[in-house]
Amino acid sequence: MAALTQNPQFKKLQTWYHEHRSDLNLRRLFEGDKDRFNHFSLNLNTNHGRILLDYSKNLVTEAVMQMLVDLAKSRGVEAARERMFNGEKINFTEDRAVLHVALRNRSNTPILVDGKDVMPEVNRVLEKMKSFCKRVRSGEWKGYSGKSITDVINIGIGGSDLGPLMVTEALKPYSAEGPRVWFVSNIDGTHIAKTLATLNPESSLFIIASKTFTTQETITNAETAKEWFLQSAKDPSAVAKHFVALSTNTTKVKEFGIDPQNMFEFWDWVGGRYSLWSAIGLSIALHVGFDNFEQLLSGAHWMDQHFRTTPLEKNAPVLLALLGIWYINFFGCETHAMLPYDQYLHRFAAYFQQGDMESNGKYITKSGTRVDHQTGPIVWGEPGTNGQHAFYQLIHQGTKMIPCDFLIPVQTQHPIRKGLHHKILLANFLAQTEALMKGKSTEEARKELQAAGKSPEDFEKLLPHKVFEGNRPTNSIVFTKLTPFILGALIAMYEHKIFVQGVIWDINSFDQWGVELGKQLAKKIEPELDGSSPVTSHDSSTNGLINFIKQEREARSQ
């Protein structure tokens, strides 16, 4: 594929941007088109509620949106989409298909990898998960002392942790009949020590989530958990009743002491950051029930169908992707804020930090050359209204343009005080996007200060600080209620957004070689931390850091 910056549609957008950038004033755009909301919004009607994508508060015109859609078409987005859904090995650096869509393929339409339909295997694992969840949640599954399971501890890292953690937090209102869930990921011993201190080994079930069963952080934490467990259980055979594996390495699983019958498989065409739909989601299913887990899958499948069949002009993931391209590659924006106005979504931005930054944080194209344009943004965010009292100042009056996605449910899970809390939350959500769009003019600020009776001295001093330029772009994503179905649809929407941007940038969104180098060096450094001899095998900084740590440890041990 030719370089993005040489693409005729890209050049057309560049020319338009340089000629018309100064004309893109959101106040004027709204004043000039009283129907702008209807022209730049999308209503997605599902059987489980509606999702509204309002992208009217973006620095775009109908001409810009059409040029962006033309760019997507010229970069082969539609063909790439079909290659993914058809099971082609689009992750070419690892020679793998990319089929998280198969994990939630509720239609059961055959999906082939190397000529073999993967759906029978997908359904077999789902049935196994369903049966296991029923036994644990009903109390039929007993621990070594005859007690039922009250706590499930998921030990994994990256995609084996972030997805299940985010979803179990988001769907807490649906967990009343399920066991509590805990997540241990960090190799820092504090994480597992603090978690184990709260647990009873007799009623704890550990899920060890590692495809290879060799991930250093996960296996170290798993061995620590097993050691803690056996201090109470004494008998190694009891491990089989309290540990299950999400893996493909039967030999290592058996060596650990886990019954292979309690090993739940997934496949090399499931990328870690897209794996919550697979057996990696076992902690989700245990916590909220398998029926709700299936609803999560169904919501994602609904979005998959929308993404696959809807024209690009009305396609939610595509529109989000194109708006991101507009800001990153033309306005020079470097970050993207995800701001969910729902406390249950407090891990949503963290989840998509991995989803987006590990996928599109690349500078090499599929042809092996360095890109000559920006790629993936820095993704960050916190729930509203907390963020308003932390970093919104910079979004409103800072020197950086930060495109934002605001998300909120119309219905709250907790209508306490006759819905007062949620009404205030909704008002803040609506006010922020309006404020970022409109700002406050010098004249408006002047009238405000006059009405407040400020002295001439205060007036002159305060006026510049009271002005808001506005013209800050936002998307508003409003949905009926945060249900398993709607959550599944929202996650899939952002997954496909990331995919579309990767296609336009001509990068492989499904490998993660950037994770490897640090791990390789850590293996070399680990034995160098033993003993007291100074280390000289690295650069002066790394040598100095290692030797400082060794000196401090030795001094404290004397």
Swiss-Prot record:
- PTM-bearing positions, type N6-malonyllysine: K454
List residues, modification Phosphothreonine: T109, T250
Q: How is it modified after translation?
A: Phosphorylation at Ser-185 by CK2 has been shown to decrease enzymatic activity and may contribute to secretion by a non-classical secretory pathway. ISGylated.
Q: Which residues carry this modification: N6-acetyllysine?
A: K12, K142, K454
UniProt KW keywords: Acetylation, Cytokine, Cytoplasm, Gluconeogenesis, Glycolysis, Hydroxylation, Isomerase, Phosphoprotein, Secreted, Ubl conjugation
The EC code for this enzyme is 5.3.1.9
Q: Does the keyword Disulfide bond apply?
A: no
Which Gene Ontology molecular-function terms are recorded?
carbohydrate derivative binding; cytokine activity; glucose-6-phosphate isomerase activity; monosaccharide binding; ubiquitin protein ligase binding
What are the disulphide bonds in this sequence? none
One GO cellular component term noted in the UniProt record for this chain: cytosol
Q: Could you say which enzyme class this protein belongs to?
A: isomerase
Task: State its location(s).
Answer: Cytoplasm; Secreted
Question: Which residues are annotated as modified residue N-acetylalanine in the UniProt record?
Answer: A2
N6-(2-hydroxyisobutyryl)lysine modification sites?
K34
The active-site annotation reads E358, H389, K519
Tell me which domain of life the UniProt entry assigns to the organism this sequence originates from: Eukaryota
| Chain positions found as Phosphoserine | S107, S185, S455
Q: Which residues carry this modification: N6-succinyllysine?
A: K454
Give the metabolic or biological pathway: Carbohydrate degradation; glycolysis; D-glyceraldehyde 3-phosphate and glycerone phosphate from D-glucose: step 2/4
Main site of residence? cytoplasm
Q: Name one GO biological process term.
A: canonical glycolysis
Name of the molecule in the record: Glucose-6-phosphate isomerase
As for family, the record states:
Belongs to the GPI family.
- Which Pfam families does the entry link to? PGI (PF00342)
